[in-house]
Amino acid sequence: NMLAGRNSNDAYITGYKHLNPIKDFHSPQRTQDVSEEIYQHLLQGKIVILDLSVGDPDQRTRLSKIIAQHIFKRSMQTFNQGEFPPNIMIYIEEAHNIIGNKDNLSDTWPRIAKEGAKFRIGTVYATQEISSVHPNILANTENMFVSHINNENEVRVLAKFYDFADFGPSLIRAQD
């Protein structure tokens, strides 16, 4: 029994401790994959808020990616069947903790940034660490609201994608 941490011979289950960090993300009451449940809510036009502010950072990143990948695949399937996928907006707070800057271009977040609009998926990501966001995502960002960037390096990273030469000094001086 996984919950007891022992097998039918009452010996400890090998590897059980490796599953402990993800125990809080599971429930015996679940009847379907949480990614599909979220997608079904989105199909109904509902707002889904997934608070992943607590827990193991690796698990938060992994779960976010799994859910985003599911949304992307389902929307792409709908589009490929000649139907219109639902309008979906994904909002990522503290994006530098979720979207890695070293992902492959075929990974979930860069693909959503590059192809998501075709499948009616928009993305809003909030971060103060622009340099930690994948460059392909920055290159495919159409609109930016920039405030409270008090680091010259972050402004330089932003300037690689957009002309912030006129605004850089004022962005650094600006305070909340």
What are these regions (language model features)?
Residues N1-K114:
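P-loop NTPase motor domains
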Residues I112-D176:
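Conserved ATP-driven motor cores of ASCE-family P-loop NTPases powering translocation/secretion/packaging/pilus
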